[in-house]
Structure formats: structure tokens, C-alpha cells
Amino acid sequence: MNSANDGSVKKYVSQRRTVDMSSPYDRLYFYKKHAIPLRTIQPESTYTADIMPPDAYRDHRRVLNIPTKFTHLSSNKVKHVIPAITWTPEGRRLVVATYSGEFSLWNGSSFNFESIMQAHDSAVTVMQYSHAGDWLISGDADGTIKIWQPNFNMVKVLDRAHTECMRDISFSYSDQKFVTCSDDNVLKIWNFSNGQQERVLSGHHWDVKSCDWHPKMGLIVSGSKDNLIKLWDPRTGRNVSTILGLKHTVIKTKFQPTQGNLLAVVSKDKSIKIYDMRQHMRELQTIRDDMDYMSLSWHPINETIFSVGCYNGAIKHFDLLHDNSNSTPACHTIPYAHEKSVTSLAYSPVGHILASAAKDRTIRFWARSRPVDPNAFDDPTYNNKKVNAWYFGINNNINAVRPKTEHGIALPPANETNLGTPQPSILGSESIAANNGNVPASGLPGLSF
């Protein structure tokens, strides 16, 4: 709106970034219907239009599915610590739970705020959707469980289901039962249809921090502050196996969600352990760092990729098929993803966006990088700069996008080429930095093939 004699003020329209997967899915369907082979993505910006949905890259091209690009920052007007986030089953919205007991909904494409409601009287610590997407279960710091419909109509309250703070919830593969764990040292199995407690799993000697139900079998895993991992038979309530070897609190235990062949365990002894269930829980790999890992999420499409959040606010992505013989096993690291400890990570059901929450009271969205994206490493998540770029990144201003020149998209200055944490090439090839000295050699989508 232009200035006029009536004193009106000129307003500038800013561009809001939107991440929409409709067009790539339509193109992928067309390619498959007519048996057209997918184009190989080359390190050139013109190949951006050829990027397909994550489901198309299950082979060696899975590197394209790693979310390396900061997309948006969201936060409530009244900010609280965010202990849990989860995507709605169709992936259109992100549900955010806070220490104030509120649920807030954020759009999963344009990342704008949609609604907020008071869900619990105390801090909401855990929540999970059923596999069918028909129900949402949440738990709070008082040990109360609430069951919600997808429209957030509350249908049942299990008051004081636990005597201490709830730590984790997991549905069975059939959605007929669910398991909960708490700081009261026990796990409980509940009948979902009537809300009745069926079994109490006792065996841990301290707070139970995590639990998960196998996606295809009648098997429950739990991790506790007593440094033990236990496997349970939900039919009998008996402990069938105990895994030793951890030196500190077990923070997270998570089965691989698609096949369930792998188990990831995060511990406060600064390690991540991967166990292979097909080989009698043999320890497949151990990843150690000098910083505590706090949260973990498996990629919903690629079975070997998972992401972890660190105590110092960093986010690291791992690929079990990647050569981890070097001193930095992560295939990609975002060193300044958050300003404080990362409390929760959640992949979109499609796998193209990763949402992260932290004790800095913000939610941040991460998408896949475009080929040779000059902003992929030139933003505050890598260089820790709080001026200009940080402001534009938060507001999604059009100035945050690097302008085009007569030679194409402007590249970072030569003194900014080493921003971030350089990693080796995931596909084992040489970085394209050998051909263009202005591109960071970081072994990432569009930067190293």
C-alpha cells in the first residue's frame, strides 16, 4: 500500500517460505506410471526442480533425505520450555506440548501458528499418536494420562495413573494396548478400549526414563536411571532380558520404526548404542562424543538414518551405512541448532522435515537442502552470528534468500567457506569444492556427490 495524503503508511509485503510436497509426489507418481527413470541429482542449482520426495531415495541416494537446511523458527508469545513435540498422522501440523500444560498447533507447510489450548493442569511431558492416527495420548508431571480425539476433544482421563512424573508412552502395533513409564520405577500396560490397567512391570530400581513397544512384535524395551535396559513380554509381564554395559542413566530407547530390527539406546555416559535384534541383541555399533546426547528420532523412510539432539544445542545426523571410521562419526552436524539443550526431535511422517524443540523455548524446522544451496551453511545455525542473518532467518524475510547475480546465485565470500563442521563425503566421492573454491566441502546434499 503506497503512501497517500490521508497519512497512510506504505507496507512492505514479505515472502513466507512454504515447504509443500504435493508437486514432487505428483511428479513421482507420473514417473512411476510411465516407467520414466528418475534423474540423478547433480551439484547444480538447476536440478532443484528434479528433487523427489524422500520415499524415492531409499538407496545410496539417501543422503538427499538428511534435513540440513534451517527453514523456520516458531515460538509462542508466552514462552515455556517444550518437553515434547509430535506430528499429526497426516503430517499437516505439529503438536507442541509445554511445561505450562498447553497444546499449540503449528502448520507443517508454512509454519504459522494455528491454535492453542490448555490441555493439562501441570507440565505435559509426553504424548504420542496411535499408529492408525485415530487417538492421541498425553501424560503430565502429575502422572495423569489423557486420551484425545484428532480434533482435540478429550474423551478420557486416567487420573494419577502414575504417582510420579510421566516419562514415555508407546502404543502396541495393534493400538489395542499402550505402555507407560514414570519416575515411580515401574512400567504399566493399559487396555486402550476401557482404560483399565492390565499389568505392572516391576524390575527397575530407579526412575524409568524411556519405553517403547516393538512395531511388529509383542516386545517392550525400557531404559532407567539404574543404567539398565530391560526387555519385557507384555503378555506375561515378565522381564525376558536385561542388557548391561551402560555407565549412566538411559535416556532414550527406540526401536527402528519400519522394520524393528534395530534398537537405539541413548545414555548419559555420552554414548549411543545400536543393537541388532536379529543377532540376539548384539551390539552393532557404539557412538561416543564429548557432549551428552538428550533426544533421538529415527528417520521414517530410511532405516539406517537417525538424528540426535545434544545438551549443547547441536543436532547430529547419523547413517549406519556411512563410513564411521573417522573421529567424527556423524555424517552431518548442525553445531548451533539451538541455544540450549535439545529436548525433542520429530520427523514428519513423509520424512522431508525435521522439527526440533529445546530448553530455549523455541521450535525449529529443518528441511532438505537444495543442490548447491548457498544459504545451507551461511546462517547462524553454523556460524553462531546473532545479527542480520539471524533476524532474517527468524522472520523468513525475502532478504534471507541470497540474491541472484549475472553469474547465477551469489556464493558466500571466500572467508566464510569454512563455516560449520566439515564432514567427509557420504557417498565416498570428492567434494565439488575442488571445482569451485567458494563452495564448502562438507559432504552434504548438493555439496558433495
Swiss-Prot record:
An annotated GO cellular component: chromatin
Region (Disordered): 411-432
Annotated localization: Nucleus
Task performed by this protein: Required for 3'-end cleavage and polyadenylation of pre-mRNAs. Also involved in chromosome segregation where it has a role in chromosome attachment to the mitotic spindle.
Originating species: Eremothecium gossypii (strain ATCC 10895 / CBS 109.51 / FGSC 9923 / NRRL Y-1056) (Yeast)
Chain positions of WD repeats: 77-116, 119-158, 161-200, 203-242, 245-285, 288-328, 337-376
PROSITE patterns reported for this sequence: WD_REPEATS_2 (PS50082), WD_REPEATS_REGION (PS50294)
Domain of life the protein comes from: Eukaryota
Keywords: Chromosome partition, mRNA processing, Nucleus, Repeat, WD repeat
InterPro entries tied to this protein: G-protein_beta_WD-40_rep, Pfs2-like, WD40/YVTN_repeat-like_dom_sf, WD40_repeat_dom_sf, WD40_rpt
Biological process per Gene Ontology, one example term: chromosome segregation
Protein name: Polyadenylation factor subunit 2
Listed Polar residues bias regions: 415-432
Main location: nucleus
Coiled-coil parts of chain: none
